[in-house]
Amino acid sequence: MPVRLVFAGTPEPALPALRRLLDSPRHEVIAVLTRPDAASGRRGKPEPSPVAREALDRGIPVLRPARPNSPEFVAELAQLAPDCCAVVAYGALLRDELLAVPPHGWINLHFSLLPAWRGAAPVQAAIAAGDTITGATTFRIEPALDSGPIYGVVTEAIRPTDTAGELLARLAVSGAELLSATLDGIADSTLTPRPQPAEGVSIAPKITVEQARVRWDLPAPVVERRIRAVTPNPGAWTVIGDLRIKLGPVRLGAASDLPAPPEPLPPGAIHVDRKSVWVGTASDPVRLDQIQPPGKKFMNAVDWARGARLDPAARAT
């Protein structure tokens, strides 16, 4: 008999896991729990989450409570009588009363090798820190943040040019298989969770738009990693003149196919030549590749600088 599941998730990275469970004969997804519709686009029209859209397309009931820990929703979930709840980036903390509803608990897929990088932004934190290995972990949710016992892990190398979006896309796919296998093992009574180690705990809080502003007073490798860590969301940015400019990943001098400026650049100083745009950091300059001026799409940095006619004294701040 298939395991009766409620799937809790919201953004696009949760879709591979949802699809894997929907297509499995061993799992019956009886409902999807997701965050309420959120304003999207220039008009701010409320739109369903990616998980809600997928569920609606598949004819799966969608639950969108504003207060998932309310007594009313706890009772509604209990009426569904799930055996287990699977969670991938749902986006809300779950309290004891809700956690107690399914007999096999709430099983979360988290995109780090716990106990490293507990929190909302584990992929971004791993890239920014310069980690070379990360992964995904399945664990049983407990009230404390990402602290429950572990069922399984899968590892993933972090490539030198990975953005958070690229790495998360790979982890979402490998993590979907891990979550499915974990749920199978729980149903078969062949998996026993192990406590998380007390050592190696690190926290990865959500990154704000303000924190995504580039700090040119840091060394070039740190600047480069931090930009990749917030690409595509919330997106790295800087101010040049009176313009707020979004930045795509940058190139270190050693990784560039074009020569660096002949003179050292202080942090934030800009050098423009015929083929490249460079910005100074606390160590070596970095080369801008793609930038996004206000109200426009991403474009080549050289083309933008040529059209903008930058003041020779212009700085990125």
UniProtKB/Swiss-Prot annotation:
Name under which the protein is recorded: Methionyl-tRNA formyltransferase
Stretches that traverse the bilayer: none
GO molecular function: methionyl-tRNA formyltransferase activity
PANTHER family with a match to the protein in the record: METHIONYL-TRNA FORMYLTRANSFERASE (PTHR11138), METHIONYL-TRNA FORMYLTRANSFERASE, MITOCHONDRIAL (PTHR11138:SF5)
Record NCBIfam families: fmt
Enzyme class per UniProt: transferase
Catalytic activity: L-methionyl-tRNA(fMet) + (6R)-10-formyltetrahydrofolate = N-formyl-L-methionyl-tRNA(fMet) + (6S)-5,6,7,8-tetrahydrofolate + H(+)
GO cellular component terms listed in the entry, alphabetical order: cytosol
Role played: Attaches a formyl group to the free amino group of methionyl-tRNA(fMet). The formyl group appears to play a dual role in the initiator identity of N-formylmethionyl-tRNA by promoting its recognition by IF2 and preventing the misappropriation of this tRNA by the elongation apparatus.
Family the entry assigns: Belongs to the Fmt family.
Native source organism of the sequence: Mycobacterium avium (strain 104)
Entry keyword annotation includes Signal: no
Entry binding sites for (6S)-5,6,7,8-tetrahydrofolate: S112, L113, L114, P115
Record Gene3D superfamilies: 3.40.50.12230
Alphabetic keyword roster: Protein biosynthesis, Transferase
Enzyme Commission number(s): 2.1.2.9
